[in-house]
Each structure stands twice: as C-alpha cells, then as structure tokens.
C-alpha cells in the first residue's frame, strides 16, 4: 500500500499502524513523520505493530529551517529518538537509506549478536569498511586461537590471520572458499562480510560462485548471516546477480554494506528494548493526591497549560526535584531578586502567547 493521511483530521498514524499490523499482505511498514497529535497512542500502536513486522521511520524537521516550515517544536529530536528506540522501530535519515534498510531487514534473519567478521582481497576496501563500522559504533569479532590455527593451515603463507582477514590482491576463488569454510566452523562472530575488489588475478564471478558453493554445502551455511560487497559497478554485475539469485544480500560499496549491517544491529537493540520492562527506582515516592489537587485547581481556574513555577509543585509531589523559580514583573525586580539569591542566574520570558521562548531569544543563561 501507499497511504497518505493528509492533515490526519480523522485517521491518524496510530490507526494506520493498528490496521497494517494485522494485515497479512504487509511485510514491512515505512513511515514518514512530521509531528504527532497523540504521542502516547502512537507509541502504544508502534510497540504492538513492531512485534510482528519491521517498522522504519523517517522523521523530518531536524534543522531549524525545516522546523519553521513544518511548524513543529524545536529541540525534540532526542525525544523522538528515544521513543522510536523504545518502541522497537528503526529510524533512518533519508529515503535511500529507508529502502536499503527495509530490503535488508525483510530478507535477512535477525542477528544473534553484534560482532562482525570481515574477509577481503585487499586492505583498502577493508579499511573503508572499518572506518564506517567505527563511525557507527560497531563491533569487530575476535578470532579464537582454534580458528586462527585453522586459517593458517588453510591459507597461503604470508596471509596475516586477523580481523579483517586480508587474503591479498592475488587471492583466488579457492582461497575465498577455504577461508569461508573455516569461518563457517567458527562461533567467533555473528555476521560475516565478504568483500571482493576486481583484479586480473581474482575474477569476481568465480569468487562469487565459490562463496555460494561454500555456503550451499556447509551444514551451517544457511544459518550464518552473510553480507557481500563485490566492488566495481560493471565488472561485478554478474556476481551481484548470482548473489541475488542465491538469496544473499549484496551491496556496491563497503560503506553501504556496513550501513546495512548496522541497521540490523540497531534494529536488534531496539527490539531488545521493546521486550524489556522499564526499571523502576527502589525509593519511588509519590503524593498523587497532592498532584491531583494541584492539577484540578488549575483546571478549575480554566488553565490549559502550566507555567514553570506551576509545574514545580506537581513534580515535587512525585519526588522530582526542580530548581527554584522566581517571577519578576520588570527588569528592576529581576535584578533585585538576582542579587538576593546570588549570581549566575537564568532569565526566561514569561508569556502565554509564545510557546517556545528560545525561538525569540526569550531564554538567557548564565547572567552575572
């Protein structure tokens, strides 16, 4: 389906999630969000739907200019990230990443861990993959001595046994097959990335066939998460077609492959958060009757929002400490209060007509 909700006057995103979660023809849900009318309902619907199928989110309005255009609150992006993670969703940054991520999550089995093993026929593409993995806070696997010994016996003298495993630029398809067969016997990693750079000594199509054959005939071949990156836009077209036909995910660049792997990692982390019960503090004390009385008084007075000094008593009723707040009618009174309590102080504009004071320079910090 392709569904546009317009201004969401009658049907909102949470209604849509409830429907798509139960729809047997829907395997994944892709969301574009600007704002929410009911955050609580959205999180509830998202948590329920994400237990059954992957949900990917693009949230616009990250820049001040976009926030102004969309009339959305500034400074809310960290809250969006926290809600998306807690609901078991995956947030992506652009449409290219959106479709790449849904392709990865829809066709690959979930990861059982986050450790990555890299095999390459050159240091350069492996280094690019490592840089991207480091930037995204990914984890490299550590090879056991048993696996290292098996690789030394299987590979030519001179190949450094490490992660990444650089088979060198003269690696043949047989070297790829030997290395992968040894690694398939190992439990040291959670995902295997195989990289190939085109060279005269190492034809890409033959190496691709060797990898497919190794996975096909090994008992663990269909249970291991394998990602492939055969570099070369035209020279590796046939290899990428073979991988697609074999059901193996394949990517054009080392960075793109790492991005796909980290999508799986982040999705795994968020799904883990989805299943966790929030930890409650041992010494939680709440005077709910006092809080209810304060809120009821505000409702009786016709208030629809609470000022900073009005929120503080409600928070204190739940044991949440806040900084003391004073109200000044003019600048002279503000100076007098500041001299009484001591500098530095923060000054905030008080106006019911301006919901976001910082947007009009209505918040000044560290005044002396």
Question: Which positions does each model-derived feature cover?
Answer:
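Catalytic-core regions of core metabolic enzymes
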Residues: 1-368
């Amino acid at each position: 389906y392709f569904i546009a909700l317009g201004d969401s006057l009658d049907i909102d995103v949470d209604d849509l999630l409830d429907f798509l979660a139960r729809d047997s023809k829907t395997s994944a849900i892709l969301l574009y969000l600007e704002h929410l009318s009911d955050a609580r309902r959205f999180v509830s619907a998202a948590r329920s739907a994400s237990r059954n199928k992957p949900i990917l989110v693009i949230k616009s309005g990250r820049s001040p200019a976009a926030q102004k255009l969309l009339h959305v609150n500034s400074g809310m992006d960290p809250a969006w990230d926290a809600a998306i993670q807690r609901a078991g969703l995956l947030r992506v940054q652009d449409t290219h990443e959106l479709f790449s991520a849904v392709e990865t999550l829809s066709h690959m089995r979930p990861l059982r861990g986050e450790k990555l093993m890299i095999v390459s026929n050159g240091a350069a593409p492996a280094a690019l993959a490592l840089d991207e993995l480091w930037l995204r806070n990914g984890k490299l696997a550590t090879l056991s001595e048993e696996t290292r010994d098996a690789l030394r016996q299987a590979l030519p003298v001179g190949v450094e046994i490490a992660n990444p495993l650089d088979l060198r630029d003269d690696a043949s398809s047989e070297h790829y097959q030997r290395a992968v067969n040894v690694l398939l016997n190992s439990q040291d990693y959670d995902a295997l990335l195989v990289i190939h750079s085109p060279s005269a000594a190492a034809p890409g199509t033959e190496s691709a066939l060797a990898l497919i054959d190794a996975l096909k005939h090994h008992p663990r071949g269909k249970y291991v998460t394998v990602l492939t990156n055969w570099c070369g836009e035209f020279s590796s077209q046939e290899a990428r077609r073979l991988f697609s036909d074999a059901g193996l995910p394949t990517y054009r660049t080392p960075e793109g492959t790492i991005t796909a792997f980290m999508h799986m990692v982040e999705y795994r982390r968020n799904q883990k958060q989805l299943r966790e019960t929030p930890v409650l503090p041992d010494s939680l004390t709440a005077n709910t009757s006092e809080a209810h009385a304060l809120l009821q008084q505000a409702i009786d007075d016709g208030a629809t929002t609470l000022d900073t000094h009005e929120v503080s008593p409600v928070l204190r009723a739940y044991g949440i400490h806040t900084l003391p707040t004073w109200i000044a009618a003019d600048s002279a009174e503000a100076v007098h209060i500041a001299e009484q309590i001591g500098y530095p102080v923060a000054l905030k504009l008080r106006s019911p007509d301006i919901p976001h004071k910082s947007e009009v320079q209505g918040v000044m910090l560290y005044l002396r």
